Amino acid sequence: MSNEKASTKAPKFAYPSKKKYCIFCSEKIDYIDYKNVERLKRFMTEKGKIIPRRISGNCARHQRQLSTAIKRARYMALLPYVVK
């Protein structure tokens, strides 16, 4: 009489995922402009949240610049804080 249950979950990593790369490094962009709203929208969810680095594939430097640019654009009312 053991209390162990049979595991029916699939393995978490069934296949190796594709290597993500920083779009800004590949295009050799040094400064992310907060006025370029179309580029910033690509790194936000439909609810207006910033997509994390592990999903977007950005390097640490550009992810910091990206979050600062999005926050500046929100403050200047170029991007919404929350989308309903």
From Swiss-Prot:
GO terms for cellular component: cytosolic small ribosomal subunit. Keywords: Ribonucleoprotein, Ribosomal protein, RNA-binding, rRNA-binding. PROSITE patterns: RIBOSOMAL_S18. InterPro entries: Ribosomal_bS18, Ribosomal_bS18_CS, Ribosomal_bS18_sf. GO terms for biological process: translation. It comes from the Bacteria. GO terms for molecular function: small ribosomal subunit rRNA binding; structural constituent of ribosome. NCBIfam families: S18. PANTHER family: 30S RIBOSOMAL PROTEIN S18, SMALL RIBOSOMAL SUBUNIT PROTEIN BS18M. Belongs to the bacterial ribosomal protein bS18 family. Binds as a heterodimer with protein bS6 to the central domain of the 16S rRNA, where it helps stabilize the platform of the 30S subunit. HAMAP family: Ribosomal_bS18. Part of the 30S ribosomal subunit. Forms a tight heterodimer with protein bS6. This is Small ribosomal subunit protein bS18. It comes from Dictyoglomus turgidum (strain DSM 6724 / Z-1310). The lineage of its organism: Bacteria, Pseudomonadati, Dictyoglomota, Dictyoglomia, Dictyoglomales. The gene is rpsR.
